[in-house]
Amino acid sequence: SLRVWRDYFKNANILGADIDKNILFNDHRIKTNYVDQINPKSINDMWEKYNNIDFDLMIDDGLHTFEAGKILFENSFHKLKAKGIYVIEDVSHLYLYRLAEFFKDYNHIIVKLESSKANLLEDNNMIIIKK
């Protein structure tokens, strides 16, 4: 999906992160990094490499658990520019409202996406936070 974002945002530089070192790559306007989403030190080690860069858009398409979403947000939101957008994808209905409670003091919306496939109804939600 990183290549899709690069092609969609013609002037953007894309930064990706994954826990699977075997799928990391660098390509035209794309850099990927190893990050353990539930380890604050791992997240902050990545941000140290990009100390002078802030982001317009951040998309969490990681582990899809409450804890992982919370930890990544807590250690990454400071890298979002003013008026930037932070998106957590594929949020399960099992912890959607826990995340909503966590984000109650932030400007956020919950997007419940419908699907014709029954198995997609459980984790086809998003939380969008605007700085």
Describe the predicted segments one by one.
Residues S1-P40:
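SAM cofactor-binding core of SAM-dependent methyltransferases
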Residues S1-V4, F55-D56, L96-E101:
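A generic short-segment signal for beta-strand/edge and adjacent turn/coil regions
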Residues L2, I59, N124-M126:
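Extracellular structured ligand-interaction cores
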Residues V4, K21-I23, M46-E48, S76, ...:
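Short, flexible, glycine/charge-rich loop motifs used to bind or transfer phosphoryl groups or to couple energy/partner
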Residues D7, N44-E48, E101:
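Charged/polar, solvent-exposed surface patches and flexible loops
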Residues N13-I19, I53, H108-K112:
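Short amphipathic alpha-helical surface micro-motifs
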Residues K31-Y95:
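Active-site segment flanking the S-adenosylmethionine/decSAM binding pocket
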Residues F66-K131:
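C-terminal substrate-binding/active-site "lid" region of AdoMet-derived donor-dependent transferases
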